[in-house]
């Protein structure tokens, strides 16, 4: 299992990240976990979305490198579709620990 995190930060103001967050919640089934955090059910499984002050964090657990690559591509597509012309930076990292809501 691979635990991936994406930190999505705006280049031109926080509005682009807030737009992405709202769009994900409107478009996909989601369940609140706690304040500013919820699980979003993507086609490939759940992702933990956390609203942080400087951006949006998306955590996911995948089975292998192929699935990791697929999720990166899927999130990039979601961002391109939902943010529409606004620019954001996405920084990927891996973690040895899995966030509790994804266990």
What positions do the PLM features span?
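C-terminal structural segments of small proteins and small subunits
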Residues: 63-99
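Short acidic, gly/pro-rich beta-turn/loop elements at beta-sheet edges
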Residues: 16-18, 50, 68-70, 100
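Short, flexible N-terminal segments of the mature chain
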Residues: 19-37
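Polar/charged, Gly/Pro-rich intrinsically disordered segments
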Residues: 38-45, 94-103
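Short glycine-/aliphatic-rich beta-strand segments at the starts of folded cytosolic domains
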Residues: 1-12, 16-24
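Ser/Thr- (and often Asn-) enriched beta-sheet segments in non-cytosolic proteins
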Residues: 3-7, 41, 89-91
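A general secondary-structure signal for short beta-strands and their flanking turns/coil
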Residues: 1-3, 53-55, 85
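Short, intrinsically disordered low-complexity segments
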Residues: 32-66
């Amino acid at each position: 299992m691979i635990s991936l995190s994406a930190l999505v930060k705006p280049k031109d103001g926080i509005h682009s990240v807030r737009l992405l967050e709202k769009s994900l919640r409107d478009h996909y089934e989601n369940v609140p976990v706690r304040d500013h955090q919820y699980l979003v059910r993507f086609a490939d499984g759940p992702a933990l979305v956390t609203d942080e002050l400087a951006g949006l964090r998306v955590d996911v657990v995948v089975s292998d490198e192929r699935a990791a690559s697929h999720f990166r591509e899927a999130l990039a597509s979601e961002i391109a579709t939902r943010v529409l012309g606004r620019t954001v930076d996405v920084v990927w990292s891996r973690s040895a620990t899995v966030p509790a809501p994804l266990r």
